[in-house]
C-alpha cells in the first residue's frame, strides 16, 4: 500500500544562504546521507584496492564506432535497467515504488517525486514524516527565482525553443552556486565538496516549477504569469499551477479543467515525473551532466549541459513524434474499431522503411513498465478518455502493433515504450505545445543525474578522460588481432 504523509508534522525553518533548512525529529535528507556515506566510501575503497584490475568487459571496434552502446564503462548508483523487469530505482521496480513511496495522503494519489528523490539519494524509502518535511523543504527552497534569472528569461524571444530557455535559465543560476563560490574562495576541501553540491542540487530541483512556469508563459502568454507559487503544496502541484493547468485560486486554469480533471492532471504530472527521474547513466542527458560535473562544474552548469543534450531529437523528442503519429494516423483511418485498417496502415509505414514511433527499446525485451503505469492511468479513467480518439488509438495500438512488428521480424522488442503514452496524455489535458513536453521531461530527469553528481563528489570520483582512437589506430588493432590468430 502507498505510504501517506501524516498531518501535523512539526516543522520549523531558518534561512541560510538563501536556502531554507527544515528541522524535525526525523532525519533530514542530509543527515540520512551522512549516515550511509562512510559505508559507501569504504566499499568503494575496498573495491579499488582489492579488485581494481578486474576486467569489466570487452570493447569492440563496432562499439567504439557505434556510440559506445552496451559498453559497461560508467559508475551509476541510482538506477539499473533490467531486460525483464525494466528500470529499477535503488533496486525497486516501478510497481514497488508505487506501493511503497509516500504520497500526499489522499486516496488514489500517485507517490511524490520528492519521495523518489529521497530514495535515489539515500537508497532508502523515506518515512511519512521525512517525506512531509522534505516536500516542505523543497517548496521553501523554490519559492523565488534569482532576480537575474528572471531578467534573463524576460529578455528572451518568446518564440525561442523552450529547451533553450531552460538551459539558459539554469546556467544563469550558476551565479548563486554555493559550490562554485566556496570552491573559488578555497573554503572547502575535497571530502566536503558534496555538501555544497547537495545544496545547489536541491535548490536547482526546487527552482524547476518556477522556471518551467515562466518558460511556458513565455511561449503561450507573452510572459504573463499563468499561476502562482505556493509553499503549501508539493512540487508537481506547483508545476501544474504555474502552467495554468489547475482549477484552484493559484492558477488561471486556461483549459477550464474541472476539479477532478485538475486532480488527475496533477497526478499525471506526479506519475510522469516520478518514473522519468533516471534511466541509468549512459543516456545523453545523464552522461553529459556527469561528464561536465566531473570537471568540478557546479550543478547548474552541469545540468544545463545535460538539458542541451536532452533537447536533441534522438533523445528527448520521442513523445512529440508519437503525438504527431497518432494524430496523422487518426486522420487516415475511418475508425479505431477497424483493426484491419490499423494493421494495413502500420504495414504501410514499415514497408516504406519508417518506424512506428513509441515502440521498441534498446535493452528491454518485455513491455516497458513505465508504459504500463501510464496506460493504467488512462484505463482507470475510462469516462475521461472515452471521446478522445487519440488516447483510444494509443490503447488500441498497444494491442495490435506488437503483433505486426513480430510478423515484420526486424524488431528485437515489439512492445510499447513509455513515449507511446506520455505525450498524448499531456496533449489530452491541454498541453498542445509539443516542444514543451521535453521541458517537463527535463524537470523530472534533474533528479537522477544530480543525485549521481552528489555521489560523485562524496566518492571523490575523478574527471572523466577516456582515450580516443583515430582510424589508423583502429586499423592497427585489426592487424594485431590477425597476427594473434595465426
Swiss-Prot record:
Recorded source organism is: Saccharomyces cerevisiae (strain ATCC 204508 / S288c) (Baker's yeast)
> Coordinates of motif Microbody targeting signal in the sequence?
484-486
The protein's GO terms of the molecular function aspect are:
2-methylcitrate synthase activity; citrate (Si)-synthase activity
Going by the entry's taxonomy, the superkingdom of the source organism is recorded as Eukaryota
Q: Which reaction does it catalyse?
A: oxaloacetate + acetyl-CoA + H2O = citrate + CoA + H(+)
Identify which residues the record assigns to the active site: 315, 361, 419
Could you tell me which pathway this protein works in? Carbohydrate metabolism; tricarboxylic acid cycle; isocitrate from oxaloacetate: step 1/2
* Purpose: Dual specificity mitochondrial citrate and methylcitrate synthase with similar catalytic efficiency with both acetyl-CoA and propionyl-CoA.
The main enzyme category here is transferase
Keyword entries, A-Z:
Mitochondrion, Transferase, Transit peptide, Tricarboxylic acid cycle
The protein's name in its UniProt record: Citrate synthase 3, mitochondrial
Name the EC number(s): 2.3.3.1
Q: Record keywords: Cell cycle included?
A: no
Where is this protein localized, as stated in its record? Mitochondrion
The record's InterPro entries line, in alphabetical order, gives:
Citrate_synth-like_lrg_a-sub, Citrate_synth-like_sm_a-sub, Citrate_synthase, Citrate_synthase_AS, Citrate_synthase_sf
Q: What is the lineage of its organism?
A: Eukaryota, Fungi, Dikarya, Ascomycota, Saccharomycotina
Transit peptide limits: 1-23
The record's similarity note reads: Belongs to the citrate synthase family.
- Coarse class of the primary localization is mitochondrion
Tell me, what is an example of a GO biological process annotation in this record?
A: carbohydrate metabolic process
One GO cellular component, as annotated? mitochondrial matrix
Which gene name belongs to this protein? CIT3
Gene ablation phenotype (knockout) = Leads to an accumulation of acetate and of isobutanol.
- Misc note: Citrate synthase is found in nearly all cells capable of oxidative metabolism.
Amino acid at each position: 500500500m502507498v505510504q501517506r504523509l501524516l498531518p501535523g508534522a512539526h516543522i520549523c525553518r531558518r534561512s541560510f544562504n538563501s536556502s531554507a533548512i527544515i528541522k524535525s525529529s526525523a532525519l533530514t535528507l542530509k543527515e540520512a546521507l551522512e549516515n550511509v556515506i562512510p559505508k559507501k566510501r569504504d566499499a568503494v575503497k575496498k573495491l579499488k584496492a582489492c579488485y581494481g584490475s578486474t576486467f569489466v568487459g570487452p570493447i569492440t571496434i563496432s562499439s567504439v564506432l557505434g556510440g559506445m552502446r552496451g559498453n559497461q564503462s560508467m559508475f551509476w548508483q541510482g538506477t539499473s535497467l533490467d531486460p525483464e523487469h525494466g528500470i529499477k530505482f535503488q533496486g525497486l521496480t516501478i510497481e514497488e515504488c508505487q506501493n511503497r513511496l509516500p504520497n500526499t495522503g489522499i486516496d488514489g494519489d500517485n507517490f511524490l517525486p520528492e519521495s523518489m528523490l529521497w530514495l535515489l539519494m539515500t537508497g532508502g524509502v523515506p518515512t511519512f514524516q521525512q517525506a512531509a518535511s522534505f516536500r516542505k523543504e523543497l517548496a521553501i527552497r523554490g519559492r523565488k527565482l534569482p532576480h537575474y534569472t528572471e531578467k534573463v528569461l524576460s529578455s528572451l524571444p518568446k518564440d525561442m525553443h523552450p529547451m533553450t530557455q531552460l538551459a539558459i535559465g539554469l546556467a544563469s543560476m550558476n551565479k548563486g552556486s554555493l559550490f562554485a563560490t566556496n570552491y573559488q574562495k578555497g573554503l572547502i576541501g575535497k571530502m566536503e565538496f558534496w555538501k555544497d553540491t547537495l545544496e545547489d542540487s536541491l535548490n536547482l530541483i526546487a527552482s524547476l516549477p518556477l522556471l518551467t512556469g515562466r518558460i511556458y508563459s513565455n511561449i503561450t502568454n507573452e510572459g504573463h504569469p499563468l499561476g502562482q507559487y505556493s509553499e503549501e503544496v508539493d512540487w508537481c502541484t506547483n508545476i501544474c499551477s504555474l502552467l495554468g493547468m489547475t482549477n484552484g485560486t493559484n492558477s488561471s486554469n486556461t483549459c477550464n479543467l474541472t476539479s477532478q480533471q485538475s486532480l488527475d492532471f496533477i497526478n499525471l504530472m506526479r506519475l510522469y515525473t516520478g518514473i522519468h527521474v533516471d534511466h541509468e547513466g549512459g543516456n545523453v542527458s545523464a552522461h553529459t551532466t556527469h561528464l561536465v560535473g566531473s570537471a568540478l562544474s557546479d550543478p547548474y552548469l552541469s545540468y544545463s549541459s545535460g538539458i542541451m543534450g536532452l533537447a536533441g531529437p534522438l533523445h528527448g523528442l520521442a513523445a512529440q513524434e508519437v503525438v504527431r503519429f497518432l494524430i496523422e494516423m487518426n486522420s487516415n483511418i475511418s475508425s479505431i474499431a477497424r483493426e484491419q485498417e490499423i494493421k494495413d496502415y502500420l504495414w504501410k509505414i514499415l514497408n516504406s522503411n519508417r518506424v512506428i514511433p513509441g515502440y521498441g527499446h534498446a535493452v528491454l525485451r518485455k513491455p516497458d513498465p513505465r508504459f504500463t503505469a501510464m496506460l493504467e492511468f488512462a484505463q482507470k479513467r475510462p469516462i475521461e478518455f472515452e471521446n478522445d480518439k487519440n488516447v483510444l488509438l494509443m490503447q488500441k495500438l498497444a494491442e495490435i502493433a506488437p503483433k505486426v512488428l513480430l510478423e515484420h521480424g526486424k524488431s528485437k522488442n515489439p512492445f510499447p515504450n513509455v513515449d507511446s503514452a506520455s505525450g498524448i496524455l499531456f496533449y489530452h489535458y491541454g498541453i498542445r505545445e509539443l516542444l514543451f513536453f521535453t521541458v517537463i521531461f527535463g524537470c523530472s530527469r534533474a533528479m537522477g543525474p544530480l543525485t549521481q553528481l552528489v555521489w560523485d563528489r562524496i566518492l571523490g570520483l575523478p574527471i572523466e578522460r577516456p582515450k580516443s582512437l583515430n582510424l589508423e589506430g583502429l586499423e592497427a588493432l585489426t592487424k594485431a588481432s590477425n597476427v594473434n590468430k595465426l
